[in-house]
Amino acid sequence: MTLAYIPSPTISQFSIGPVTIHFYALCILLGIVLAVWMTTVHWKRYGGNFDQILDITLVAVPSGIIGARIYHIITTPERFFGPTGDWVEMFRIWNGGLGIWGGVLLGALAAWAWCRHKHYPMALLGDAVAPGLLVAQAVGRLGNWFNQELYGAPTTLPWGLKLNMEGSAIGHSEQCYDGATCPTGTLFHPTFLYEMIWNLIGAALIVFLGSKIMKKLKAGSLFAIYIMWYTVGRTWIEALRIDFAHEFLGVRINVWVSMAVFVLGVVAFIVIQQMGKSTELLAEKLRTVTEIELSLVEDGETGLPTAKANLTKTKDEITANDGSSVSYADDQSDNK
């Protein structure tokens, strides 16, 4: 008889009148709120403000969710298009199914496009968002707990996960390897908990590095560290999971993807350290852009002379190190 285990929730949703609210969605929303808050704190230290992060969030988050869903659909097409598939399930995100790499890719592309449009240093944004992104992913994993999904192999460890076979939870089957049903009461590795702990440790590590040795790192280094940290954790945690997944050479596709992205993270870190721009220089650029925006908001077109005057003090440095012209005060006047 098992004396210690992690219980599963008895519900995965609740209703307020005609509206059904899923805990999976609430976990994602809470993660987004925490990520925005943490990103804003770090972004302000670089010279930006909350309004800039809010604008980026409104562009990047919807794009990231769409990208994450597309990645899941591509990697598990039989759920939606197979003989037993249902294409309507593509739109039922609350039932689970978001692929982190699709979210990071499309969300990052959207953020990059907005930063380029507004002349914000994308490398600084990556560093600012890195710890918050890990915290958001950690909180989001709680949604898997409520859905009783993505658990690992059977275990006898005292922190094993015991599935709830009653109530309104989505996961009702104690599946072992190859879809076979395990004996009732089987405990499973709580992979959601492993990833939560791993991500929170990574977030703390990145915050520590950012506060202690940031002057030794080029802008963008913290985001590269995020990529390396997350992919290492995802590789070993993914290997514990027993839910259905496509494989290549006997290894889950997501493991291959994580290893490939880890290599890209290492390469990115090396390139950034060799060819990247200093955090202080890009922070000065961000402060200047922020001053321009504030001048335009407060003074309108009459604020352009002041904005251009503020820009003069960093024009030579930014032009030399950013490889682009710094005559964007006029552009900002069009975007106010």
From Swiss-Prot:
Q: What pathway is this protein said to act in by its record?
A: Protein modification; lipoprotein biosynthesis (diacylglyceryl transfer)
Q: Which GO terms describe its molecular function?
A: phosphatidylglycerol-prolipoprotein diacylglyceryl transferase activity
Residues in a coiled coil are none
Q: Which residues cross the membrane?
A: 16-36, 53-73, 93-113, 190-210, 220-240, 253-273
Which InterPro entries does the record match to this protein? Answer: Lgt (IPR001640)
Compartments where located = Cell membrane
* Keywords, sorted A to Z: Cell membrane, Membrane, Transferase, Transmembrane, Transmembrane helix
EC number of the protein: 2.5.1.145
Recorded hits in PANTHER family, A to Z, give: PHOSPHATIDYLGLYCEROL--PROLIPOPROTEIN DIACYLGLYCERYL TRANSFERASE, PROLIPOPROTEIN DIACYLGLYCERYL TRANSFERASE
- What's this protein's function? Catalyzes the transfer of the diacylglyceryl group from phosphatidylglycerol to the sulfhydryl group of the N-terminal cysteine of a prolipoprotein, the first step in the formation of mature lipoproteins.
Q: What is this protein's record name?
A: Phosphatidylglycerol--prolipoprotein diacylglyceryl transferase
